[in-house]
Amino acid sequence: MTIIRKSHPLSKIVNHAFIDLPTPPNISGWWNFGSLLGMCLVLQIFTGLFLAMHYTSDTLTAFSSVTHICRDVNHGWLIRYMHANGASLFFICLYIHIGRGIYYGSYLYKETWNIGILLLFLTMATAFVGYVLPXGXMSFWGATVITNLLSAIPYIGQDLVEWIWGGFSVDKATLTRFFAFHFILPFIIAALATVHLLFLHETGSNNPLGIPSDXAKIPFHPYYTTKDFLGALIXIMFFMTLVLYFPXXLGDPDNYTPANPLNTPPHIKPEWYFLFAYAILRSIPNKLGGVVALILSILVLALLPYIHTSNQRSMMFRPISQFLFWTLVSDLLLLTWIGGQPVEPPFIIIGQTASXMYFTIILIXMXLAGLIXNKXLKW
């Protein structure tokens, strides 16, 4: 068996990626989220495939087809809620995965990090077009508002919006093309995730100490396969509790009414995992400025390898940077809360302050903290 595992062209790839892969001996539970993201992607592709068998992407029947899935299809309600809440699980794992990358300095693997940012953009795009598909009230207005942001692009903006809509508003053409995008994007994500892994295995994994671990590596199997399996088991337990007991807790009640172009919901807001970016978008009183800030809120991650000033890779032994990191986490939670609130005082000023803090901490404060740490340690 060992001979085939190491010699057969196909099993050799799997062997080098998941079995005989040399892994640092001290990576903690924060390193479990990569495999959990893989699990989420597989879950979403399979539940999505079964939903697509019964869904119709027509404005007249989209909402009814989702209702039909929940009422008439065997276990349709379960598949639908697993898919809807699976997106939330995906983003929870994604944000923790990125946070771990920032905390332990994993962004210094530039290729892996940049492909990760591309994966984040693609996942956000997939989640957005997917949210439009049930053609509920919040789906319709969310699609209208977010696609309309493109009209802020000078000169070609309005034409671009109408080109994406396939008409003069969100209609049948929009729904059909969004369904097509929603179906194809996860497979592109899966392909990119493989490339992400390929680049990671070129350098090997980072570890909590942020120091080379070449001297003490251990095989991935059985140590980390077991650990990943335990992580998956815990995540599935929490996930199924959410799906079976509180399936509609993370959704928007407005989405249980069919889309109506004549009736606007009181507060148009996206799903919870986009609220921080939505708050940054709304905190700038200019349309184009808001769109630029929205894109920069994610793109700023690409600058991290270039503004890393510390002589230590990880934040494990850098208390000032740790304080800033957790301040950033609190700031993002604050932005998430603000994104779900109406645009009125005092929320406007809180949102603007939190947005400014977000960029200040990442671009200025973290770079300065690294320099201070170097100075204090006389490095």
Swiss-Prot record:
**GO BP term, example:** mitochondrial electron transport, ubiquinol to cytochrome c
Recorded GO cellular component terms are: mitochondrial inner membrane; respiratory chain complex III
Specify which residues bind heme b b566 according to the UniProt entry for this protein. Answer: 97, 196
Question: Main site of residence?
Answer: mitochondrion
InterPro entries, A to Z: Cyt_b/b6_C, Cyt_b/b6_C_sf, Cyt_b/b6_N, Cytb/b6-like_sf, Cytochrome_b, Cytochrome_b_C_euk/bac, Cytochrome_b_N_euk/bac, Di-haem_cyt_TM
- Per the UniProt record, one Pfam family is Cytochrome_B
Q: Where in the cell is it found?
A: Mitochondrion inner membrane
SUPFAM superfamilies assigned to the protein according to its UniProt record, in alphabetical order = a domain/subunit of cytochrome bc1 complex (Ubiquinol-cytochrome c reductase), Transmembrane di-heme cytochromes
Q: Does the keyword Transmembrane apply?
A: yes
Give the membrane topology.
Answer: Multi-pass membrane protein
According to its UniProt entry, the function of this protein is described as:
Component of the ubiquinol-cytochrome c reductase complex (complex III or cytochrome b-c1 complex) that is part of the mitochondrial respiratory chain. The b-c1 complex mediates electron transfer from ubiquinol to cytochrome c. Contributes to the generation of a proton gradient across the mitochondrial membrane that is then used for ATP synthesis.
Q: What else is known?
A: Heme 1 (or BL or b562) is low-potential and absorbs at about 562 nm, and heme 2 (or BH or b566) is high-potential and absorbs at about 566 nm.
Q: What is this protein called?
A: Cytochrome b
